[in-house]
């Protein structure tokens, strides 16, 4: 009997250790400046303090921020690598990107429309040239690899949320004169005969998995896109543009999250997205913008489980 009691007490004592072993980790990327001045000026960097406030309130202890000049493609990839290396089973991970988006030629031939959707790091050029073929664009193919690597580390009990306050298309007319749009209407066209962009993209993915020590290549560039084994919140539908708030000059999706999380504790994902869309609609004057939620994990855990204590 005494042995059973001791065993039971030991089990109880072990529970807090297991609970505390779960770590909340975040990577926050915000861009309001670009090395290539052909990109229109936006305020993605101003989103970062709002996101930091959300994460602090939600109890995130490990937060990496990359703002403007620090958010190069190499810097972002390195942050993903460090995040993956640090993650453990059951961790909660939040990835936030505020910046430009652009479509470019799908060099891996795995997209139905022939276009990759890209995040735009600090050192990415807006147009292809004799010396630039999309090497610094961060494609959805690469992002899927990095995010799936994190998912594999945190396991089935882990939670992964990705927020993208950008869009992958734009409108040259920009609607109202003072509208600031995150995204551009032109596609970066890569010459299929020029393999430079493909090579660097492939090498980045390869080194992420196997390093530079010549181990067997585990990446198949012709494979279908990896599954979206997380929840993604995007600022708008693919056929819409993402227009910033006028006051304050920040991302509309980021500001909606910051505002609504102050007013709500824990609700289901459908209800939470309903509130986010309602906020965006209230603050949209020129063109419709509807935030979207996608991913295989939509019914597995709640967004507010991640972004609140």
Question: Which residue ranges define each predicted feature?
Answer:
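Bacterial N-terminal signal peptides that target proteins for export
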Residues: 1-7
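Bacterial N-terminal signal peptides
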Residues: 7-16
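Cysteine endopeptidase catalytic domains of the caspase/legumain-like
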Residues: 21-309
